[in-house]
């Protein structure tokens, strides 16, 4: 109990006022609320409406077992009454009210808040004095008010008034004002600079934002003026108008009825009446408007809600001009209770992955009270495009972001939301046309999910769609790919790159296409990250056709032929490795090439050419990682290609043939380009090509017309062997 500091002994005719000191924690709490939890002042109205809603919940709950509890007031509602003359905002509810003890305890000490806690206590046989606990939200009233008066009436006690100017103490007295019946009236005496909260527009804005889904009607009472047409005499003075009206009525009553046929006297009066001028005056009246007519759609049975209703709610929630693409409406009951209504928009926002921008996608409610709309813990980043509401029965109303991070309840809600989202996507996938629209907009999110969410990776992988070497213009799922696999095919083959045409024409897919093996085309940068985590699908390993050790289905005869080719070109491989030195890790005979002379592949755990390109484009890249991930390049040569065969013969005929070195380097650099890599020194490569062009055109390298810079570079280049231009070109060929 707070310490009672002073009791005034007054004559019996005057009401007794008791003064109490706030507990020390209250002063600290108020400072904490103002400086930490509630930086935006408008939150006070949400908290007070929420408290009213709690009080209404409690009386409604009690009336279930004892209907007579509502005899003191059948209607359950909340009224908001701004008064500009007195600079007060009053919040009135017909809830359970508070006894004197409740007032002293609940508005003088830190009290718990929440309907559920109260109901559990009541079921456990707790004393009735435990009710009406306002919680910390009440003190947020002092963000805008210099003084707060609370008048309350409980069924089991008299009407009392609590008052405090936040000066470390509060007073409690018996209230002799207008009887309330039952409920609580909170009167905020606003600070001079907070009068915006008396404006009709501002109050409506706050209620719509924070409390539009409270389960009881919230009515705003506003004093307004309207024009009323009266005669001049009436306009001059109200009393005269009344007297004149009475006199006219009396005169008309005194007239004999026989004169109703239209005497001269009546006509005169009519003319005089017509001559009287009419004038408009301002008349004051009280306008009542219910602010939360939209009842929470998520609390209704999904079977009773039409798609049009979902559409209207979605548009009001998101301000989107288009209808939603899909919707999931569900509730979870048991140890944990919450309802959720989730929408998939038709298109992704342009700033979907803009991390610095705060998201406003899923609104968190606690028992129909809006808590926050940027709750990162509620849904993983890869599902940040999902719009909707989550309404929990178990979270405390005064929860902060810091508390949310530790909340076990929220972790369970998050798990359920992800599960339901994946169910929704799977249902959507059954409609090919709609899923195509969805995938065009949100495929990156699915792939990001595969990279980040190991728990749901399998389900997410079923949602992937790709172009393949056999799919034409249709995108297919990995499941579709698996159904078309060859009998002896053990792996799922894929290639990453920039465009569909680029990967389709790549040297890496030549032999696979020739053998009728389907190759998946992964042409988005995020595919590289996705496939790093997606190692297998339905027991089949995903294999990149651009990496070393590619295993293709082959019979014994093919294996034997391949071994013979390896032996035949072993020497050339060694010579080429010596020439290229550290540029490549090794040179081997390829089993994947058909029409290309050579290609560059990467080690199993290194980056592909496409990944190297992506990483080089990163502004904040780690150069040390670039060093060891990008260096593992292997040169594969095609033993069936005429260039490689001729080069082998030339190298074996004369190991010291200088043109071999030039040709090997040229082959390597060209293979780098065709395999998707970039050149470290493009100018040197260009100069080699220019020399080939000169030879082709029969231009003498020593031609004095050649510019100095070209000549200087040419001197540095290893010369091509031969005495004349003809022999040189033959070597190149």
Swiss-Prot record:
Residue segments, region Essential for interaction with SMYD3, TSC1 and STIP1/HOP: 729-733
Reaction it catalyzes: ATP + H2O = ADP + phosphate + H(+)
Biased composition (Acidic residues): 230-246, 256-269
GO molecular function, one term: ATP binding
Record-listed Phosphotyrosine modification sites: 314, 493
Modification Phosphoserine occurs at: 231, 252, 263, 454, 477, 642
Residue span of region Interaction with NR3C1: 9-236, 272-617
UniProt family annotation: Belongs to the heat shock protein 90 family.
PANTHER family in the record: HEAT SHOCK PROTEIN 90 FAMILY MEMBER
The protein's name: Heat shock protein HSP 90-alpha
Annotated organism of origin: Equus caballus (Horse)
Phylogenetic lineage: Eukaryota, Metazoa, Chordata, Craniata, Vertebrata
Gene for this chain: HSP90AA1
């Amino acid at each position: 109990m707070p310490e009672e500091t002073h009791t005034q002994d007054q004559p019996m005719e005057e009401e007794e006022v008791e003064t109490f000191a706030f507990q020390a924690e209250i002063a600290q709490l108020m400072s904490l609320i103002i400086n930490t939890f509630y930086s935006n002042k408008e939150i006070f109205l949400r908290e007070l409406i929420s408290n009213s809603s709690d009080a209404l919940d409690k009386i409604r709950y009690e009336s279930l077992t004892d209907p007579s509890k509502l005899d003191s007031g059948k209607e359950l509602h909340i009224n908001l009454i701004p008064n500009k003359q007195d600079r007060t905002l009053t919040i009135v509810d017909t809830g359970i009210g508070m006894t004197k003890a409740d007032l002293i305890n609940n508005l003088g000490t830190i009290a718990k808040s929440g309907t559920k806690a109260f109901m559990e206590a009541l079921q456990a046989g707790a004393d009735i004095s435990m009710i009406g606990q306002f919680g910390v939200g009440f003190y947020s009233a002092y963000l805008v008010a210099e003084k707060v008066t609370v008048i309350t009436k409980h069924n089991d006690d008299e009407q009392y008034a609590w008052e405090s100017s936040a000066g470390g103490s509060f007073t409690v007295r018996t209230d002799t004002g207008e009887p309330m019946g039952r409920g609580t009236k909170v009167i905020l005496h606003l600070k001079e600079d907070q009068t915006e909260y008396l404006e009709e527009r501002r109050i409506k804005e706050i209620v719509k934002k924070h409390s539009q889904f409270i389960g009881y009607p919230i009515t705003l009472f506003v004093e307004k003026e309207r024009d009323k047409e009266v005669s001049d005499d009436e306009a001059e003075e109200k009393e005269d108008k009344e007297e004149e009206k009475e006199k006219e009525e009396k005169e008309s009553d005194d007239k004999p009825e026989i004169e109703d046929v239209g005497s001269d006297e009546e006509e005169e009066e009519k003319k005089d009446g017509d001559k009287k001028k009419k004038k408009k005056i301002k008349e004051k009246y009280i306008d009542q408007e219910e602010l939360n007519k939209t009842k929470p759609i998520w609390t209704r049975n999904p079977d009773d809600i039409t798609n049009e209703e979902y559409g209207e709610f979605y548009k009001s929630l998101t301000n989107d001009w288009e209808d939603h693409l899909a919707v999931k409406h569900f509730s979870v009951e048991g140890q944990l209770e919450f309802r959720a209504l989730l929408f998939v928009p038709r298109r992704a926002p342009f700033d979907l992955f803009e991390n610095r921008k705060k998201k406003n996608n899923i609104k968190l409610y606690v028992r129909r009270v809006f808590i926050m709309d940027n709750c990162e813990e509620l849904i993983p980043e890869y599902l940040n495009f999902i719009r909707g509401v989550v309404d929990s029965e178990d979270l405390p109303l005064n929860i902060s972001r810091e508390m949310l991070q530790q909340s076990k309840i929220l972790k369970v809600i998050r798990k359920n939301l992800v599960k339901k989202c994946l169910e929704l996507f799977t249902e959507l996938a059954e409609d090919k046309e709609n899923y195509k629209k969805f995938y065009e907009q949100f495929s990156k999110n699915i792939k990001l999910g595969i990279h980040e969410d190991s728990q749901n990776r399998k389900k997410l992988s079923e949602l992937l769609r790709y172009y393949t070497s056999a799919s034409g213009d249709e995108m297919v799922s990995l499941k579709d790919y698996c159904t078309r696999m060859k009998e002896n095919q053990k792996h799922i083959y894929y290639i990453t790159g920039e465009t569909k045409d680029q990967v389709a024409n790549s040297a890496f897919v030549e032999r696979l296409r020739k053998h009728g093996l389907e190759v998946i085309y992964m042409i988005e940068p995020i595919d590289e990250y996705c496939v790093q985590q997606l190692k297998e699908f339905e027991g089949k390993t995903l294999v990149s056709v651009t990496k070393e050790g590619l295993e293709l289905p082959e019979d014994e005869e093919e294996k034997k032929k391949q071994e013979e080719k390896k032996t035949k070109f072993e020497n050339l491989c060694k010579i080429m490795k010596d020439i290229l030195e550290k540029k490549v890790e090794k040179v081997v005979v390829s089993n994947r090439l058909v029409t290309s002379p050579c290609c560059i592949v990467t080690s199993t755990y290194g980056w592909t050419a496409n990944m190297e390109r992506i990483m080089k484009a990163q502004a904040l890249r780690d150069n040390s990682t670039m060093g060891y991930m990008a260096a593992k390049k292997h040169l594969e040569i095609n033993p069936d290609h005429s260039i490689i065969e001729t080069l082998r013969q030339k190298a074996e005929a004369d190991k010291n043939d200088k043109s071999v070195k030039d040709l090997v380097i040229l082959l390597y650099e060209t293979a780098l380009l065709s395999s998707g890599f970039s050149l470290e020194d493009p100018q040197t490569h260009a100069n080699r090509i220019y020399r080939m062009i000169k030879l082709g055109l029969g231009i003498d390298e020593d031609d004095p017309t050649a510019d100095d810079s070209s000549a200087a570079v040419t001197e540095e280049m290893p010369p091509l062997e031969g005495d004349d231009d003809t022999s040189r070109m033959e070597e190149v060929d």
